[in-house]
Amino acid sequence: MNDDAPQKHAVVTGASAGIGRAIAEFLLRAGWRVTGMDRTAPTLESEHFRAVTADLGIGADVESIAAQLVDADALVHAAGVLRVGRIGVLDRHAGELMWRIHVDAASILCNTILPAMADRRDGRVVFIGSRIAQGMPGRGQYAATKAALIALSRSWAAEVAAQDVTVNVVSPAATATGMVNDPARSASSAQLPPIGRLIEPAEIAQLVGYLLSPAAAAITGQDISICGGASLQR
């Protein structure tokens, strides 16, 4: 643990629970100053943690907050929601909600924060994607939003690579978070990967921490899977 005053500033969405909380907690232990964005009350306490209440599904709110975060050295977009449904019974409103939280929020935040990183010639962006981006029955709308994050990350990575800014996606398989027990996904339960257990949020946090480090300066535009061997089954 770094006992010195944190120098780097990370913005983490979805920081009150699940993967986002694990990432924020890991970064705090590593000596970062963290701003956590979430619509629910913060669950972390640290002198180096600042909670910002925000509904990432409301674009105007995200835009207003993003303008206050241009000093961020890293952005981790971990906020997410899952709604399931097969073709013929798709819920348009559920699809729109997932698009706003996953894709629109990422676009709004990056539209403000990424240019500032490029101007400083230093920065890291990580989106939390999903292996489901490759497609899965009953989760087409969710998959589309996560696939969009991969397309955005590769496009933006190409735009800012020469300014020493990296943009990557970390795509977990089923993870041990509250989302696994969400009643909204009861029609499509999580499947255990070959390792026989769910991915732990702390495992994802450590991978994200590496991508934010100087050692990962040459990794950009990548979709990195942490799947417990699930990809071996295809």
Predicted segments, located by residue:
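Short C-terminal tail/terminal secondary-structure segment
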Residues: 220-234
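Catalytic Tyr-X3-Lys loop
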Residues: 81, 88-108, 122, 126, ...
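A conserved structural motif in NAD(P)-dependent oxidoreductases
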Residues: 193-204, 215
